[in-house]
Amino acid sequence: MPLPDFDVETGLIKKGYKAIAGVDEVGRGCIAGPVTAAAVILNPQKIPSGLNDSKKVSFKNREKIFQSIQDTCTFCVAHSSVEEIDQINILQASLLSMKRAILGLNIKPDFVLIDGNKSPEGLESKSETIIKGDSKSLSIAAASIVAKVTRDRFMSRLDKEFPGYDWSQNAGYPTKLHKSA
């Protein structure tokens, strides 16, 4: 399977866009914890190496790449709580966390690349959805790593508060142990 690249972003840069944000979320299939989204604006001169869909990167490498993103990129992370998920449903909560991440960037993006087939409503920037975008766009891949590392760290802290669910290992995703309980 090919690695994500910077082709979509390069095309947008050639059209005059300067600040291009990639957006992705994690936690939609979980039975515990928030849905977490990240928006990342890569510096085209300092793209971190190893970027890929967070599901295809080992824990150790995700941590290294996350540090590199922190050092070289503009990003924002946002969550939708369990209560919000219950009130508005997981899809709407995912879109809400994406919108919060985009609006929370300290640089307003000219263009937003969004993983999936739905875009949050009310964005001030132009946007495009890309199905499996975390496997196609480096900006979205970076967002997937930031969202995953941030949410996994949150679930590890939650594991200390509520031992016995193994949240630090399964990050809130259902396991055979949960299904047999």
Task: Name each model-derived stretch.
Residues 1-181:
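RNase H-like, Mg2+-dependent phosphodiesterase core
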